[in-house]
């Protein structure tokens, strides 16, 4: 895909619904591409950024959970997710990041994204809607962490 293809792809995402093409183009120009391989460390999602999966998928897994339920988050082509400067909600050393070998992610630094949001209120609304969706994911992660912690702290035979 070339820049024009990426621009058209991004413009079709709910995040950029009713957002002028010029703003989407500015975000694309100021973003960087992360091309990955399998079994990334969480540090490849290292900065205060908004990430957009352009190709492949990224899976966050908790090694403490039983086989079959280790996946705590999965982002695929077209998904948008924010990560703070310390890896956001995935600070646990038990969380691993697995990306498909063909992964391509657009990393948009948050300060640039924030500046663009100040130019267009619809982008702000779309970003808030995306955060609301991620709050549910965060809550699920918290519940899993809490449940696992309680199991680890339980008295034998209780």
UniProtKB/Swiss-Prot annotation:
Membrane-spanning intervals of the chain: none
Induction cue: By fnr. Autorepressed.
InterPro entries xrefs: cNMP-bd_dom_sf, RmlC-like_jellyroll
UniProt keywords, alphabetically: Activator, DNA-binding, Transcription, Transcription regulation
Coiled-coil residue windows: none
Annotated disulfide bonds: none
Domain of life: Bacteria
GO molecular function: DNA binding
Record function comment: Activates, in anaerobic conditions, the transcription of the fermentative operons lctEP and alsDS, of the hmp gene encoding a flavohemoglobin-like protein, the nitrite reductase operon nasDE and the heme biosynthesis genes hemN and hemZ.
Name this protein carries in UniProt: Probable transcription regulator ArfM
Species for this entry: Bacillus subtilis (strain 168)
Gene: arfM
């Amino acid at each position: 895909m070339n820049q024009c293809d990426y621009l058209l792809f991004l413009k079709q995402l709910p995040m950029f619904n009713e957002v002028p093409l010029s703003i989407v183009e500015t975000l694309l120009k100021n973003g960087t591409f992360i091309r990955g391989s399998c079994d990334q460390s969480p540090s490849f999602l290292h900065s205060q950024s908004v990430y957009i999966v352009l190709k492949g998928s990224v899976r966050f897994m908790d090694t403490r959970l039983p086989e079959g339920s280790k996946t705590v988050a999965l982002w695929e082509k077209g998904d948008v997710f924010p990560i703070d400067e310390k890896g956001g909600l995935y600070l646990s050393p038990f969380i691993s990041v697995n990306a498909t070998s063909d992964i391509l992610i657009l990393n948009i630094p948050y300060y640039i994204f924030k500046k663009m949001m100040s130019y267009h209120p619809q982008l702000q609304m779309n970003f808030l809607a995306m955060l609301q969706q991620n709050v549910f994911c965060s809550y699920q992660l918290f519940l899993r962490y809490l449940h696992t912690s309680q199991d680890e702290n339980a008295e034998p035979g209780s």
